A protein has these predicted regions:
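Short glycine- and hydrophobic/aromatic-rich loop-to-beta-strand nucleating segment
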Residues: 57-60, 211-213
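Short helices/loops that flank or line small-molecule/ion binding pockets
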Residues: 2, 15, 80-84, 156-171, ...
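Extracytoplasmic/periplasmic substrate-recognition and gating elements
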Residues: 183-243, 287
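Hinge/lid segment of periplasmic solute-binding proteins
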Residues: 3-58, 73, 190-194
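A ligand-binding cleft/hinge motif common to bilobed small-molecule-binding domains
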Residues: 7-13, 173-187
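Conserved C-terminal helix/tail region of periplasmic/extracytoplasmic solute-binding proteins
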Residues: 263-325
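Extracytoplasmic/periplasmic solute-binding protein
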Residues: 46-52, 57, 76-125, 168
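Glycine-centered hinge/linker elements that transmit conformational signals in sensory
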Residues: 122-153
Length: 325
């Protein structure tokens, strides 16, 4: 048995290192783990992985002083009108986040980018909604002036540290960062990454870590039982011992409301594409975000991104065709 992330699924499958997850259908389904987990752990229509943990991005807020929001404009309005009182004097910042991270901010335009199709594995299926993405980029470019955040000086850890002390109202985190907050007394809520406008949606990316059984092992059934034990039977130990967000969605936990919301976001998320060579696409998305945030022209940044995606997709298709001959 070995562990891998969902983006490594195709490589593992083509290397012959995946044995089908077929012994426990009553356990490994969307009712227990959610849609994204099942998609991430599958390839070619068959389930191979045993989902263990996941990572995704979302907005977290301090429930003592703040409420859930839907859009970035709502946060801007709160920031512009926020007043310090005796009750909230511990708060030193309304909102800060890491604008440099592709993974955190994929959600900004994630609803309008299709990479790999519904199963995140078809290299021939890549599509972009130009109109919507440009609207997202236009608003994203305004955030630097709105919040005065230099993307080169603010990190995810900085934001998690500040939020965990109760000194910030809102920030964007990933699931791995929750371990730091869960050991504090901060009463927090979780909601989707804020959309860039009332007429726009956000959709976070997720990566799933899974156990996979090697078909060449001496006892495949025993290995499958161990994979089940790790990902299901003893899944509740993952958060307390490994400080990871458990992929199993039906556990009873201390912060049940936040846990359920996090799993809803995870289940509905965009699964990071699983095919070999897709890394170039995400790197180009990150570059596009950086360009517009730093003051670059939106049309130019998008055009460069779209052209590169088209070329990369074409090259991937040609390589795939050659490999099948």
């Amino acid at each position: 048995m070995h562990f891998l992330t969902s983006e490594e699924m195709e490589k593992a499958y083509l290397s012959g290192l995946t044995s089908e997850n077929d012994m426990y259908p009553e356990v490994y389904n969307e009712n227990v783990y959610g849609k994204a987990a099942m998609t991430a752990c599958s390839y070619g229509g068959k389930l191979y992985g045993y989902p263990v943990s996941f990572n995704t991005s979302f907005l977290v807020y301090n429930k003592k002083y703040a409420e859930a929001v839907d859009t970035i404009d709502q946060i801007r309005n709160i920031s512009d009108n926020y007043q310090i009182t005796d009750e909230n004097q511990d708060v030193s910042m309304v909102f800060e986040w890491d604008p440099d991270s592709m993974f955190l901010n994929y959600a900004a335009a994630g609803a309008y980018i299709n990479i790999g199709g519904v199963n995140a594995e078809n290299r021939a299926e890549v599509s972009l909604n130009e109109e919507k993405i440009k609207k997202v980029l236009t608003k994203y470019a305004q955030l630097k002036d709105a919040f005065g955040i230099d993307r080169n000086t603010v990190s995810l850890k900085d934001c998690a540290d500040l939020f965990s002390t109760g000194n910030m109202l809102y920030t964007v985190l990933d699931a791995d960062s929750l371990a730091e907050i869960n050991v504090t007394d901060v009463d927090y809520g979780i909601c989707e990454y804020p959309s860039m406008g009332d007429d726009l949606d956000s959709k976070a990316m997720s990566v799933t870590t899974m156990a996979v059984v090697n078909p060449y092992t001496k006892n495949v059934d025993a290995s499958k039982a161990v994979a089940r034990a790790i990902s299901y039977d003893y899944a509740d130990y993952l958060g307390s011992m490994a400080k990871k967000s458990c992929a199993r969605a039906d556990l009873k936990v201390k912060r049940a409301e936040s846990y359920q919301k996090l799993h809803q976001i995870y289940s509905d998320s965009v699964v990071k594409a699983k095919y070999i060579g897709v890394g170039e696409v995400y790197m180009r998305y990150e570059i596009m975000l950086h360009q517009v945030y730093d003051g670059g022209n939106v049309d130019t940044a998008y055009s460069t991104f779209a052209t590169t995606i088209e070329k990369t997709t074409k090259n991937n298709n040609e390589n795939s065709t050659q490999n099948t001959k």
